[in-house]
A protein has these predicted regions:
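Conserved catalytic cores of phosphodiester-cleaving nucleases, focusing on short active-site segments
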Residues: 33-35, 42-48, 62
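Structural motif
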Residues: 40-42, 73
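Acidic-basic catalytic patches of nuclease active cores, encompassing PD-(D/E)XK
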Residues: 1-25
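Short strand-coil-strand connectors
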Residues: 27, 36-38
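Short loop/turn segments at strand-loop or loop-helix junctions that form parts
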Residues: 38, 47, 76-81, 111-116
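Non-catalytic C-terminal interaction segments of nucleic acid-processing enzymes
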Residues: 25, 68, 94-144
Length: 144
């Protein structure tokens, strides 16, 4: 999905309002879309690339932003390729999210395939039961 198209979609979540759409959130950080409810954030990135480093970078930037009073989740909307599936990226990010736990208020990362998030050009309501069914959810849990 093209960047501009993604940013112009009507992303929604119960109780949240669009806070930022492609603008600079903080120095050097321009996520595709951010929804906000008080100090609770939903940060969204849509990526068509295949670089696992890119997804890790998105997660690190969200983790760095979500500190002090700010808390929230990250949603990665991914166009799958044979060498880059949602499941593969989730497994790759899982241990890094656990490692980041003491440093951030980023607690959950959702990964969802583009066509599942936006069937018929209408995005799913974020965090809805349908969204939860279609996405892979990784939590910041300490590995033992």
């Amino acid at each position: 999905m093209k960047d501009k198209l993604f940013k112009n979609l009507l992303h929604s979540a119960e109780g949240y309002a669009i806070f930022n759409s492609g603008g600079q959130l903080t120095k050097g950080y321009k996520p595709d879309t951010v929804l906000k409810c008080g100090e609770d954030y939903i940060i969204m990135e849509c990526d068509t690339g295949t670089s696992r480093k890119g997804y890790l970078g998105s997660m690190l930037k969200a983790a760095r932003y979500l500190t002090k009073e700010k808390k929230g989740i990250l949603i990665l909307v991914i166009k799958e390729k044979p060498n880059t599936t949602v499941k593969q990226i989730a497994e790759h990010l899982r241990e890094y999210l656990a490692w980041l736990k003491p440093l951030t208020n980023l607690r959950i990362v959702y990964l969802i395939e583009t066509t599942k998030y936006c069937p018929d050009k209408i995005p799913l309501k974020l965090l809805s039961s349908e969204f939860e069914k279609c996405a892979i959810k990784i939590k910041a849990e300490i590995l033992k």
